[in-house]
Curated annotation (Swiss-Prot):
It comes from Metamycoplasma arthritidis (strain 158L3-1). GO terms for molecular function: methenyltetrahydrofolate cyclohydrolase activity; methylenetetrahydrofolate dehydrogenase (NADP+) activity. One of its GO terms (biological process) is methionine biosynthetic process. Signal peptide: none annotated. Its EC number is 1.5.1.5, 3.5.4.9. Catalyzes the oxidation of 5,10-methylenetetrahydrofolate to 5,10-methenyltetrahydrofolate and then the hydrolysis of 5,10-methenyltetrahydrofolate to 10-formyltetrahydrofolate. Keywords: Amino-acid biosynthesis, Histidine biosynthesis, Hydrolase, Methionine biosynthesis, Multifunctional enzyme, NADP, One-carbon metabolism, Oxidoreductase, Purine biosynthesis. This is Bifunctional protein FolD. Pathway: One-carbon metabolism; tetrahydrofolate interconversion.
């Protein structure tokens, strides 16, 4: 019987560890900053959840919400001002504006020591093996999940289906640091004739059934990053019922990767606090294994 990778329960346990580490802490509180452009319903839900988790841990928050179709210069100016007042800041994507000329230029205005979502060019170009790098929250959440369940991701064959800057590309770079790994990368439409060779398959295409059960070997570890809402039903990029039969471990949607993305962001926020206040490093030794992913 495949093991369901319970991201919700792990997220709750990790939040409890963070709360414990901060229970006796008397230093400056981390401040989570979020810049949102427009009023997209999905974004509102995600932003509210991030703020709720941060505040439940006793962190401070700052949400800066800009009107739809703000200009690139307006967004950059607002981002710079907001970043100066917080420990770490994220730009909630997508930005609802038809006046953006270069999204990466906006993201590159996040100070590197505050880029807790890891989307600046500096972080995207890194190999995530330096103390000042931030691995994006979703890849970091995936690593937290694999580590917790003692799933080998250091000397195996791993397939990454989907090559976005948010998930696929940074995760491929991080996993490539382990020299005994074989990393196979696919975009959503490329042939996957050799996908059955992978021991771990991570799917993040945003397309339902971009990987199907017949492409997988028996005993595959399946990590589904996608999320799709159809009426009252929520599912991932995989057809859970058919892929479940091929899996040794599998993430549910919801309740798999999603909850860990938010807690990974909190670990990155703590890392930003330490980078800006090196004297605080000793305060969070109990969290070091999570912060330094």
């Amino acid at each position: 019987m495949p093991v369901i990778l319970d991201g919700k329960r792990l997220s709750e346990a990790l939040q409890a560890k963070i709360a414990m580490a901060f229970s006796a802490y008397r230093g400056p509180k981390p401040i989570l900053g979020i810049l949102q452009v427009g009023n997209k319903e999905d974004s509102n839900i995600y932003v509210a959840h991030k703020l709720k988790v941060a505040e439940s841990l006793g962190f401070l928050t700052k949400l800066v919400k800009m009107p739809e179709n703000s200009t690139q210069d307006e967004i950059i100016g607002t981002l710079r001002n907001a970043a100066a007042e917080v420990t770490g800041i994220i730009v909630q994507l997508p930005l609802v504006s038809n006046r953006i000329e270069n999204l990466q230029e906006i993201l590159d205005n996040i100070p590197i020591e505050k880029d807790i979502d890891g989307l600046s060019s500096y972080n995207l170009a890194s190999n995530y093996n330096c103390k000042d790098n931030f691995l994006s929250a979703t890849p970091k959440g995936i690593i937290l999940l694999l580590k917790h369940y003692n799933i080998n991701f250091r000397s195996t064959v791993i397939a990454l289906v989907g090559q976005s800057n948010i998930v696929g590309k940074p995760l491929a770079k991080y996993l490539s640091n382990f020299k005994n790994n074989t990393i196979k990368t696919y975009v959503k439409d490329t042939p996957k004739d050799d996908l059955h060779e992978a021991k771990i398959v991570i799917v993040a295409t945003g397309v339902y059934q971009s990987v199907t059960a017949d492409q997988l070997a028996n005993g595959t570890v399946l990590i589904d990053v996608g999320i799709h809402r159809q009426g009252k039903t929520i599912h991932g990029d995989l057809d859970f019922a058919s892929c479940f039969k091929k899996a040794s471990y599998i993430t549910p949607v919801p309740g798999g990767v999603g909850p860990l993305t938010v807690v990974a962001l909190m670990f990155n926020l703590i890392k930003a606090l330490i980078l800006q206040n090196p004297n605080l490093d000793h305060e969070f030794l109990s969290l070091k294994e999570f912060i330094n992913i």
